[in-house]
Amino acid sequence: MRRFCRLLFLNSLLSISICKAQNPAHLVADEFKEHFNVEEKQLETVEELLLKMKKLAHSRSFAGREFGHDAVEDSKKEVAISTQQGTIDKKVSPFLFEGDIFLSRRQAVDILKALSKDKTKRLRRSFVSDKTATWKSLPIKYRFHESIDFYTISQIIAAIRFWEDSTCITFENVSDAPVGDYIEFFSGQGCYSMIGRNGGRQGISIGESCVKMGVIEHEIGHALGLWHEQSRPDALGYVSIERDFILPSYISDFLQRDDEIDTLGIPYDLGSVMHYGSTAFSVDQKSKTVVTRDSLYQQTIGQREKLSFYDVATINTAYCKEECKSEKTECEYGGYMRPSKCSECLCPDGLGGEKCEKNEDAKNAECGGILELSDEWKTIESPNYPDPGYEADQKCSWLLKAPKGKRVEIEFIEDFSFLCTSTCVDFVELKISDDLRNTGFRFCCYDKPEISFVSQIDTAIVIFRSQLSADIGFKIQVRSTESEPRTTIAPTIITTTMAPITVDTPNVWADWGEWSMCSRTCGGCGIRSRVRSCRSKKCEGRRQEFGTCNLKACPVDKHCAKLLSNNRLCNGKVCTKNDIAISSCDAPQCCPPFVNVDGMCQSDQENHHDELWLSI
């Protein structure tokens, strides 16, 4: 069997090494059977149920049209649920619901039954309502399949760390397949996962186009029990579905459901990492299929940077009610005690400090702050506005406070320019509703917002974020006002409060256990882990740590080839250039960022061997 290695250089900064076995005869069904606790017959049943679902939804929406013809035509086109997430692989598409969900047989049957009925009553029921689908014991065990490369592993661990830091959910990496329930990360044909715990081996596919923290957090969110945000029964109060622009055979992927989904009292969040993008399943990948009721939210939906505050709150409400019970909640602006560390507040985006009382600390820039407003205008601008402008990977936030009884007025002035994408990646965000926990309006591209914004309460938050590019940025002026607020959709207030945990004894950790076996035999991209147990009721710190291992360079493989790809943005605009070169693997190989030095894999980054995994 021939092998190939792929080495990608992204934005001249990140390198990814991918080695796989090529086998043209490989059946897509084998991917599901290998990584999920499913047999051939079950897989066929799920495929049949999904097809019935598609046909039924198609007949109701497009009476008189032939489903078979539409399905054939649609299969020729690329589809995705968000421009920030990879396209859906056509080979796995027949087995997936809503683009990236592999349903259990029971879930598929329940959804088809609900679709077959004429339901007129909608219950306020984004979380799986089946209580058996929650993970009963922690930590959740997981392992990496050999198809996962070194860089992807690091991104998966970073995503897991984000979940662990923000919730009471804990994970444990294991080298071999354990007995019982566990997650197996593998490099499959696209990005997909199951909803909730399904028993035994449960895969999460992180394909080549999925190696982004927000996408990985999204797929882990499915495994914990999160459905897509726009599937909630209350979704049509916030978005409308434009059927004329949806690929007809995919209309079943736009259902709002009540029986399978429980909102847990969490407000609808247009900035959820679980939300479809505006061109999901679009006929031409440009026409909008999901349109926000408030047009100012249009470029907010579909983000895949990270979990939103309410994404995390949903899981904390479902799993962590017993945490932090004895702690007095002193967090401001809707923050609450962090379940993973009850002495800290978990703050809404844009806020920070011990009690969420101040703006969030800046990232890679000197900016942000707290502004006490008066009737006089004050100005705020992005870093280095307007020239040379902001740089990639910066963040700033400003907490704006008007006198009691007044509101905050915001106007954009002078030049305005950001990287232009259908879902804003670089943006300025205004949080001006009476719920500062929810995501606000995000603005990008080149057209300066011309209207004057007025907050609903005496406080507002402005957030600047750049992920990919450099550009001019924004400048605004702010002041206090007695004007009426700009009308917008009022988010529902959370009805389920976080139950604040008793820590009766100080941290008492046991000694670290033995290191696990290395996941690779050579090349420096292997990892090993070890765990320790908490001997007191509550411990702070990591219960598992990771290290690199087997740093000897891999032997020469004459059948191996490298694909070098260089992708970069130019001048901060939408401009991408791809350069490809082929070369043979004629020397012992190391996984990036390691290089072969006298037969050993060493990093060109100082202390990289020792610190990479321990710092994740």
From Swiss-Prot:
Propeptide span(s): 22-125
Subcellular location(s) per record: Secreted
This protein's UniProt keywords: Cleavage on pair of basic residues, Developmental protein, Disulfide bond, EGF-like domain, Glycoprotein, Hydrolase, Metal-binding, Metalloprotease, Protease, Secreted, Signal, Zinc, Zymogen
Residues the record marks as carrying a glycan: N173
One GO cellular component, as annotated: extracellular region
A GO MF label: metalloendopeptidase activity
Catalytic residues (UniProt): E219
One GO-annotated biological process of the protein: proteolysis
Cofactor(s) listed: Zn(2+)
Organism superkingdom: Eukaryota
Pfam families xref list: Astacin, CUB, TSP_1
Domain TSP type-1 intervals: 506-555
Segment forming the signal sequence: 1-21
Comment on bound cofactor: Binds 1 zinc ion per subunit.
Function: Mtalloprotease. Involved in molting, a process during larval stages in which a new cuticle is formed and the old cuticle is shed.
PANTHER family: DISCOIDIN, CUB, EGF, LAMININ , AND ZINC METALLOPROTEASE DOMAIN CONTAINING (PTHR10127), ZINC METALLOPROTEINASE NAS-36 (PTHR10127:SF849)
Protein name: Zinc metalloproteinase nas-36
Gene source species: Caenorhabditis briggsae
Gene responsible for this protein: nas-36
